[in-house]
Each structure stands twice: as structure tokens, then as C-alpha cells.
Design a protein with these regions (language model features):
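An N-terminal assembly and electron-transfer interface module characteristic of large anaerobic redox
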Residues: 1-293
């Protein structure tokens, strides 16, 4: 009834989206429901073979993300992101996509709705910070599309940023939080594999990230994982943690006496560009910290 009255008043389609905090740990938490509702107004249209939708985030990818170029290599002419749509009509053109690319697991239900209602299939990619795994994922993606991507320059640029930071700050020991653009456990695994220490992680264990936890346990058994939802974290004392740099807003809160990178910007880091930008940001944060009087 409320939606109908709103439609009459605004002259625009309106859909309800319920935000129940108690569903946070359930099958369809609030952010999953929001993503699903965002696309519920799309109407069927004739499909175009050179159109792709990127699903998963409420803001676009960073503009130098190599994924755009790789899609163009595959013959894609138009890449839609809901946050970049200028008006309702452009939003409706998302129904013309040949397929959807799911970049965040919380958009999976939305992609399934696309498939059921609009007959648009989807492919899911994971945001990663391990350079070799990013390459493997792109190769698998290219195989599905029947193309071989040229991602060498982007991969080398990311590796160069990692190497430059490591050469300047080889003894960095990270605290990695979950309030940032990435999975805390996957990013921690990447940092350990790059040769850094990760004494502490603050994150929520899920089915998706358990594989990273198992790998971390094998190569960095001294790493400790904490839950931000645990009330006793109010008394957390990181003085003897060995941490000298923090990634994520929560990690920065726990470790206020060392340099940090919030890494929670609106434009979404992704792929090799995400790795490169992260290590450039880490280098900049360390440099600023050293320049303090």
C-alpha cells in the first residue's frame, strides 16, 4: 500500500526493501536483499551480444581496473554498472545484457533473479589480492568466453608495486580488518604469501573464506583471528601484538599508534589494479608516518 501511494505521488515505480537486522547471519541478509531489490524493476528487453552487467557493488570499479579492458578484448562494447546509470532509461538497458558478471557474493541472489526473470546467465568472479590467483581466475574466465586475455602489463604493474613496498618496508607486520574493500582472510593470505607477517585478523568466518583460513593455518600458524562482534573486544590491548601497520577501519581503531590504510573508499578496487593501488596506498601511509615530527 505504501509503495502504491508513493508511485502515485512520484510517478515512478517503487518497490519495498526490508532491512531486518536479525537476518544478518541468515540465508538472505539485508545487503543481499538490497541488491536483489535494486534490480527488481528491470523489464525484459531484446538481448544484445556485446553488453555485460557488472553486479555486486553500489559504486563503480576504479577507472583504471583492467577488467574493463579485458571485457573489451572479449568483444564487449557496453559495460553497465547500476551506480553509473545516468537515469531510469539507462538503468532499464541493463535488461539487454548478454550475461552478468557477479563480483561480490552478496549479488548472487540478484543474479539468479536476472536468470529466472530475464533469462540472463551469470558468471561469478571473486575479488582477490593474490596476483597469481587473479591471473588464474582471468584465464578460467577467458576460457568460458573462448578468448585468451592479455593481462601481462596489469599483472606486472601490480607485482612491481608489491616489490617496491617490500623493498622499502620488509619488516611490516599487518593487522587486517574486515571493514575494508576485500575479504580480511584472503588479503591476509596474500600478504603472508608476499613475505609479510600478519599477527592479527579481525573478521567474520564464512563458508566462502574458510578455504583461506585453512591455507593461513598451514603457512602462518601464529596468526590470530578475532571477531569484531565479540563483546570482550572492548578490552582489546594490542600493545604487545607485534603489529606495525593496519589495513581496514576496524584494524586502525585497534592499532592507533601505527600507520594505517582504511581501504574503504567508494570506488571499488578490483583485480591487479586493486593490488597495485593498495600497495601504493600502503607506501604512501608509511611515508607520511615517517614524516611526522
Amino acid at each position: 500500500r505504501v509503495c502504491r501511494k508513493a508511485e502515485e505521488a512520484a510517478g515512478l515505480p517503487v518497490r519495498p526493501c526490508y532491512m531486518y537486522a536479525l537476518t544478518r547471519e541468515g540465508r538472505k541478509p539485508p545487503m543481499v536483499h538490497v541488491r536483489q531489490s535494486l534490480y527488481s524493476l528491470l523489464e525484459p528487453r531484446k538481448k544484445r551480444g556485446n553488453v555485460v552487467n557488472l553486479l555486486g557493488f553500489f559504486s563503480p570499479l576504479v577507472d583504471d581496473c583492467e577488467l574493463y579492458d579485458l571485457l573489451h578484448q572479449a568483444g564487449v562494447k557496453t559495460i553497465h554498472e547500476i551506480s553509473a546509470c545516468r537515469d531510469y532509461e539507462e538503468y532499464q538497458t541493463m535488461s539487454e545484457a548478454n550475461f552478468n558478471l557477479v563480483l561480490h557474493p552478496e549479488a548472487r541472489f540478484a543474479a539468479e533473479d536476472f536468470h529466472d526473470r530475464l533469462k540472463i546467465p551469470f558468471i561469478e568472479l571473486t575479488r582477490l589480492y593474490q596476483i597469481d590467483k587473479i591471473g588464474s581466475q582471468y584465464r578460467a574466465f577467458g576460457k568460458v568466453l573462448g578468448v585468451t586475455f592479455d593481462d601481462q602489463a596489469a599483472a606486472e604493474s601490480a607485482q612491481k608495486a608489491v616489490d617496491a613496498f617490500k623493498a622499502q618496508y620488509p619488516e611490516t607486520a599487518f593487522a587486517v580488518g574486515e571493514c575494508m574493500n576485500g575479504d580480511a582472510f584472503e588479503l591476509s593470505l596474500a600478504l603472508v604469501r608476499y613475505g609479510f607477517k600478519v599477527p592479527e585478523i579481525y573478521g567474520t568466518i564464512t563458508a566462502e573464506n574458510f578455504i583461506y583460513i585453512k591455507q593461513l593455518a598451514a603457512i602462518s600458524p601464529e596468526t590470530r583471528a578475532y571477531s569484531n562482534m565479540e563483546p570482550t573486544m572492548l578490552y582489546y590491548d594490542g600493545e604487545n601484538s607485534g603489529v606495525n601497520m593496519a589495513i581496514g577501519k576496524d584494524a586502525a581503531y585497534y592499532h592507533q599508534n601505527c600507520p594505517n590504510v582504511m581501504w574503504n573508499q567508494d570506488r571499488q578496487p578490483y583485480g591487479y589494479a586493486g593490488v597495485r593501488r593498495l600497495f601504493e596506498a600502503l607506501t604512501e601511509a608509511e611515508n607520511r608516518w615517517e614524516e611526522q615530527p
